[in-house]
């Protein structure tokens, strides 16, 4: 058998998920995330992150989630700072910039953003005719396979709050990061240290 690690969605669902779907297949539920199963899932997530006040939405994919989060959080003249290798800068076919929000990709040696890299972008964008950086986008795990430690995320969070920037964590590979032996972050840490994040594979 050949195993492909190209992505986390090349196969169907786990047999237990398929079984649960079969058991509820003939239930009649409201659409648009207004069903009891979605409500239950949201409650489980709130418990896991320790935030009863969390606003949770079910979105169909990573690009759509990135697009919604960034376009809802930013004003038309504001921009998002990310690693040069960041998914929104490289792989989403201009989806973010199509909404009018400039993506400010910063060169990094390891795909990780730091306060110093963010400060460089802030220092460069001071002219009144330039976009105003208002959000920092990070991925965990990153597009090059590195991960943020709790200390690194705490430093980013403190810096962003000091500078009045939103911190958004792309969780397309969050499942891999959270289960990695090298990781020391929990979902509760991420919920506490970021303004927006999502849970992917």
Language-model segments: residues:
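Conserved PLP-enzyme active-site core in the AAT-like
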Residues: 1-201
